[in-house]
């Protein structure tokens, strides 16, 4: 998927019907936090670590993961450059929710959530 296709299919917070994803989107990922790194992936990872008070396990291949009370999180930097890896994460039944922001992707393992894939701006 290229950036234009992603932009045309992507939704904003007003189209989110999952309370967990809406809260994650508005209160964590797009909060205005002073001191946040500039990059989208680094900024999202920094905000998640700060919100949940945990340090992520960062791998050199552009993936990071951590566990918290809301579940297990997996972040992928530039998932569309590694389309096979991102598709395998989306198809894996362990991950209930996947969030595709084009420049980074987030997968969440939380058995209380229904299985959904969100394409977001």
Regions found by a protein language model. Name each.
Residues 1-73, 79-121:
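A short alpha-helical cap/connector motif
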């Amino acid at each position: 998927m290229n950036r234009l296709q992603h932009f045309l299919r992507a939704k904003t917070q007003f189209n989110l019907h999952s309370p967990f994803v809406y809260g994650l989107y508005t209160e964590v990922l797009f909060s205005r936090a002073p001191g946040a790194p500039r990059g989208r992936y680094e900024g999202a990872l920094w905000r998640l670590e700060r919100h949940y008070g945990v340090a992520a396990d960062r791998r050199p291949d552009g993936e990071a993961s951590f566990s918290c009370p809301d579940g297990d999180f997996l972040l992928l930097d530039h998932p569309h450059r590694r389309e096979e890896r991102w598709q395998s994460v989306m198809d894996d039944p362990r991950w209930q929710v996947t969030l595709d922001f084009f420049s980074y992707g987030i997968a969440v393992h939380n058995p209380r959530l229904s299985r959904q894939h969100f394409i977001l701006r």
